[in-house]
Every structure is written in C-alpha cells, then in structure tokens.
C-alpha cells in the first residue's frame, strides 16, 4: 500500500493548474448513459474514481476511451447490460448515479449498494424515493438496488426532504427522459449540479433553474451527443489556496473560477490572506504571515463547503487564536483531528463541533488518512511540520486529487510516494 513521505518546513509558493472537478465529472459520466450518440468530454481528471466509473460504464456496454489529448470519448448507443456490479461499485458511493439514467432510458437497472469514504451516513434513500415518485418500482435484494418501470418515467413535483447533491442529480438525470414536467423543490445548488445540467441541455434536455433550489425539467424523448468541458475543481483550488495560507506562501491557481468559492475566499481574507481574482485565476499571498483563526460552519452551497472543512481545521491548528468549527453536513468528519493532535495540534471535539487552539509549530510523525479531504490535510500538515511525516492509506487522495505530489513539488514541497514494503 502506497504512502507519502513528506519533509517539512516548506513555504509553498508558485503556480498550479487546477484540474477538472471530480464532483462534476462523475455525474456527467453517468449521465452519458442517457445519450444515443457519441459524447466527447474534456478537462476530465485522471483519478481512481474516474477510472472506476469508466469501468462501470464499460461493464454496461459503453465504449469509453481517452484519446491522445486526454479527452474522454464515450458511446452509449449499444448498452446491453443493466447491472453495476459489487466488485466495481464497492469502492465508490457515486456509483448509485448509474441507476437513474438506466431506468430513464432502458426502464430497468440495478446497482450494488455502494462504498466510498467512511464519513458517516450518506443514505441512498433520497435517490430511491425520488425515482419511486417518478414511477419506478424499486426493491432491495441481495445487496442490490433494483429498479424498473413498465414504460417511461412520469414527471411530477418532488420535494427533497434534506438538501442532497446526490439525490438532486439522480432525479434531474431521470427526469430528462420522463413524460411531462418534473419540478425539484429544495434542490441542492452546487456548481457541479449546474455543470451537469449544462451538459444534459447540450444533449437536448430541457432543464431550467439549476443553481437555485427550484429546478424544472421538461422531459424529452431522447438525448443526443455533444462535446463538453468539465468545470474546474473548486475544492482542489481551495486546497492549494490553503497550502499557501498555512505556509506563509504565495500561490496562483490557474484555470479556475472564483465565483464558485466565495465562502472560502471570504474566510481566507478573514484569516489575513491577500486574495486577488481574475476571470480564470485566483492568487493568494500570505506575505510570510501566520494566519488568524477563523470560525467555520459548513452548509450546503452557497455556504461553506464541507469538503474544505478538514483543510481549514489544519489552518486553525496553526493559526493565531482559538476557533470553533461546526460540521453540519456529514457525521464522523473530524477523523483527521486526532491525527493532527498527534502532530502537536490542540483541539477538543464535542459532537459536531471542534474547538481548535492554534500552535506555532506542528511536528512530523506517522499518520493515517481516513477519507479524501482528511488525507490532504495531513499531507499539507506534513509540508509545514518540523521533521518527517509519513502519511499512510493515501489511496484516499488518489480518488480525488490528480497528480497531487507533482503539483505540490511544483510549489516547493518535499514529498515522495513509496510502497509500504519499501520502508525497511
């Protein structure tokens, strides 16, 4: 199993090119199931979860390949299987997104109950209830969610009980081929939902209101092919801005959009960072200063993103002052804090709240990554700690960050990947 060895006390500065957003690329790839003609996608990151998704699509009968430019070429015109099997689905919760387009286009589909990051309850109930309201019959048998409908799904008004990005995307995909009009109330508003809707509309869907809490979908009979470029990854952008903020450095994030990161940029400025934005870049300069502690409360977009909570927890661990971090989206999302405490951080956890007391210096040690965003916070901690830090279970990072060690080295980090068997 691979690990990272990180040598600390680096000031991270330079320019980094931001990859396409995993959280947009995944639903867009599954939405290709709806298309009767070839699709070309660009700015798709090279990640474990992307490769898993491509393998699921291939299992269904989709032709899926990358060309010499890195574009992903897909042809779903001859899908001949309707099951996403356990051996592929078990590593990735996003696999549930295969179900809605299969049922919408082929009137049947089954997906193994999914796996992924262990950060508390992420139930598929909202996906299932949304499809049922559109007319699908769904049963859970032998670890599989099995759905079918005798004819086309039928549009209706659906109120999502708790704001859910995943359920919003599932219902939106399914409704594109339903009879009549579907209205999603209390829809999630994330930029990745807007990008998925833009992609579906390019294929001939009729979706309006994406980015608001009220999405309307007028069903059509078929979706065609298109070309689409995936939006930049706002969480990767925020992660590299944090890298500069905690190390006193200056980082320019290229190929990104500031308007998807307002809540994060506001908090970075509150922490003392100088942040300048252009149409396609964000520059953060700490001018060599230590950050100031900032209180964080995660919330659905446009609030503060839960996927940036671990990175800001690290910032608060090394900031001047005391801060309160409240996690409202997922359970068990403070699993990085005990590891940061082992590095010399000071914090107490009570329920969904953590209180961080900033220290001047962290110390390198061996730590274990527990999920995707926790993993990257430990790597960044190693970059600024004294001595050497070993980060174990970095397969979590490979699920969501493209070429992470190369990008960090480009900013001056001293980091190397090695196999656990190479330690001796």
From Swiss-Prot:
UDP-N-acetyl-alpha-D-glucosamine binds at residues 93, 122-126, 162-165, 307, 329. The modification 2-(S-cysteinyl)pyruvic acid O-phosphothioketal is found at residue 117. Phosphoenolpyruvate binds at residues 22-23. The keyword Ribonucleoprotein does not apply. Gene3D superfamilies: Enolpyruvate transferase domain. It is found in: Cytoplasm. SUPFAM superfamilies: EPT/RTPC-like (SSF55205). The keyword Transport does not apply. It holds the Pfam family EPSP_synthase. It catalyses: phosphoenolpyruvate + UDP-N-acetyl-alpha-D-glucosamine = UDP-N-acetyl-3-O-(1-carboxyvinyl)-alpha-D-glucosamine + phosphate. Keywords: Cell cycle, Cell division, Cell shape, Cell wall biogenesis/degradation, Cytoplasm, Peptidoglycan synthesis, Pyruvate, Transferase. InterPro entries: Enolpyruvate_Tfrase_dom (IPR001986), Enolpyruvate_Tfrase_sf (IPR036968), MurA_subfamily (IPR050068), RNA3'P_cycl/enolpyr_Trfase_a/b (IPR013792), UDP_GlcNAc_COvinyl_MurA (IPR005750). The active site is at residue 117. Its EC number is 2.5.1.7. Transmembrane segments: none annotated. One of its GO terms (molecular function) is UDP-N-acetylglucosamine 1-carboxyvinyltransferase activity. GO terms for cellular component: cytoplasm. One of its GO terms (biological process) is regulation of cell shape. Belongs to the EPSP synthase family. MurA subfamily. HAMAP family: MurA (MF_00111). Cell wall formation. Adds enolpyruvyl to UDP-N-acetylglucosamine. This is UDP-N-acetylglucosamine 1-carboxyvinyltransferase. It comes from Haemophilus influenzae (strain PittGG).
């Amino acid at each position: 199993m691979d690990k990272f060895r990180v040598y600390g006390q680096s000031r991270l500065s330079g320019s980094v090119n931001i990859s396409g957003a995993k959280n947009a690329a995944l639903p867009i790839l599954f939405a290709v199931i709806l298309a009767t003609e070839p699709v070309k996608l660009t700015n798709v990151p090279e990640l474990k979860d992307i490769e898993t998704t491509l393998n699921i699509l291939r299992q269904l009968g989709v032709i899926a390949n990358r060309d010499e430019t890195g574009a992903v070429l897909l042809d779903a015109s001859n899908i001949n299987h309707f099951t996403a099997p356990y051996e592929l689905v078990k590593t990735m919760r996003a696999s549930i997104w295969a179900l809605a387009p299969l049922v919408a286009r082929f009137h049947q589909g089954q997906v193994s109950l999914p796996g992924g990051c262990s950060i508390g309850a992420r139930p598929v109930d909202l996906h299932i209830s949304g499809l049922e309201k559109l007319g699908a019959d769904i049963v859970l048998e032998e670890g599989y969610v099995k759905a079918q409908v005798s004819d086309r799904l039928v549009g209706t008004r659906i109120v999502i009980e708790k704001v859910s990005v995943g359920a919003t995307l599932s219902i939106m995909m399914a409704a594109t081929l339903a009879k009549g009009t579907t209205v999603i109330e209390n829809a999630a508003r994330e930029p990745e939902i807007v990008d998925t809707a833009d992609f579906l509309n390019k294929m001939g869907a009729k979706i309006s209101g994406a980015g608001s809490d009220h999405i309307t979908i007028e069903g059509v009979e078929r979706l065609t092919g298109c070309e689409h470029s995936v939006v930049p990854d706002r969480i990767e952008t925020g992660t590299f801005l944090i890298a500069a903020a905690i190390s006193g450095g200056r980082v320019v994030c290229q190929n990104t959009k500031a308007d998807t990161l307002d809540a994060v940029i506001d908090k970075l400025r509150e922490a003392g960072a100088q942040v300048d934005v252009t149409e396609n870049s964000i520059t953060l300069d700490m001018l060599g200063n230590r950050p100031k502690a900032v209180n964080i409360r995660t919330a659905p977009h446009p609030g503060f993103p839960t996927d940036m909570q671990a990175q800001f927890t690290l910032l608060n661990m090394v900031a001047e002052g005391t801060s309160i971090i409240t996690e409202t989206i997922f359970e068990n999302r403070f699993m990085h804090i005990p590891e940061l405490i082992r590095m010399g951080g000071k914090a107490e956890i009570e329920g969904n709240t953590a209180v961080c007391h900033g220290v001047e210096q962290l110390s390198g040690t061996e730590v274990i990554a527990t999920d995707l965003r926790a993993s990257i916070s430990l790597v960044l901690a190693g970059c600024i700690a004294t001595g050497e830090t070993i980060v174990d279970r970095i397969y979590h990072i490979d699920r969501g960050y493209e070429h992470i060690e190369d990008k960090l080295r480009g900013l001056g980090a001293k980091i190397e990947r090695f196999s656990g068997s190479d330690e001796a």
